[in-house]
Amino acid sequence: EQENIRFAWRFESAWTLIWVLRLVREPLTTPRNTCDVDRIIAIVRDTDNLAALACRPDNATLDKLELFRRYHWAVCQALENGQNIPSHLDANVTRERFHALSWYTRQPGFETWDGDTETSVARN
């Protein structure tokens, strides 16, 4: 069951990579709401040759990485200190989007997709 939950949350990572690939126009916003899984499936299903797509510029992706690193840090600090997670953040969405950006930009510790971004963030 835990593996199924983890798989389901990976759609947030997929949404982030869809953003990197410029398959959506809207910005990658504050991680407070979950993505639309049906939309992700439709986008991937209806896009020919994903490997040929041009990604967003490095500076845009690195700017998002830094922003999501800060969101992730805020969530982890709140949990470690027994405080409430900031109300504008969802811990799981934050974790998965940070994971995807870290993996895509080849950050140390994120060399493999299946690596874990667990730093005190709840998995359920």
Question: What residue spans do the PLM features occupy?
Answer:
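Extended, charge-rich alpha-helical interface modules
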Residues: 1-124
